[in-house]
């Protein structure tokens, strides 16, 4: 599933095509994705102007001139592509062309900018929903999400408070969207490696007895921010389905230190350890047991 950097990469690609533009036509090529489209979805969206395009956790949010907001989730295999007025996909910054199967083009937005935005989703785990922007605090998909890891509210003190007293593992805590929003398996593994922390370590050890942040918490917050910034700059990680809106692949996967590197040498200078893979809560975890404690 796309994580924060992949969704942010998609947002940056959609922004020039959608922000400030009007939905001239909305074509739904099936009645549902993961969930059925709302009966008035097309009518509410057609003719509205996108006043802002943002991201919350792994969701894209398009604010509309009507006061509605369009929530979009990529699911497991969803992707957007932007087609220029001449019919060509927007050129990308990277090198790998997209393999298109247009039978999975389920939603087509024709924008007043002359560009066409297409949502393609082979597995159909993605979804879209309209809701009133003023009621965002009550929107079920967004309610209860933790702070953004790249936002000002996310710091070592906040993370220590969220983890204080927790008996769960550090990795499980970071994957809990109520603790911090948008992190997934890839970037949690990579951030824990950079902070030299074991994914098996108790989350509670990020807090002192008084509830303040430990040095571990400080290092982890810095590692999370750094990994996410680098991944966004690289266009995200393309392991299976992620594509940018240009149809190009991201390339942060070439910078992985531990994820998907089982039995390969640890990249910490002088460590000499080997990356191990094991299963935590049904997900593969990658780490170097020698330098992650």
Swiss-Prot record:
Per the record, the domain of life is Bacteria
Cofactor dependency: Zn(2+)
- Enzyme Commission code(s) on record: 3.2.2.23, 4.2.99.18
Report the record's disulfide bonds.
Answer: none
Q: Cofactor note, please?
A: Binds 1 zinc ion per subunit.
Name any one GO molecular function.
zinc ion binding
Please provide an example of a Pfam family that matches this protein in its UniProt record. Answer: H2TH
The job of this chain, per UniProt, is described as: Involved in base excision repair of DNA damaged by oxidation or by mutagenic agents. Acts as a DNA glycosylase that recognizes and removes damaged bases. Has a preference for oxidized purines, such as 7,8-dihydro-8-oxoguanine (8-oxoG). Has AP (apurinic/apyrimidinic) lyase activity and introduces nicks in the DNA strand. Cleaves the DNA backbone by beta-delta elimination to generate a single-strand break at the site of the removed base with both 3'- and 5'-phosphates.
Q: How does it assemble?
A: Monomer.
Query: What is the official name of this protein in its record?
Result: Formamidopyrimidine-DNA glycosylase
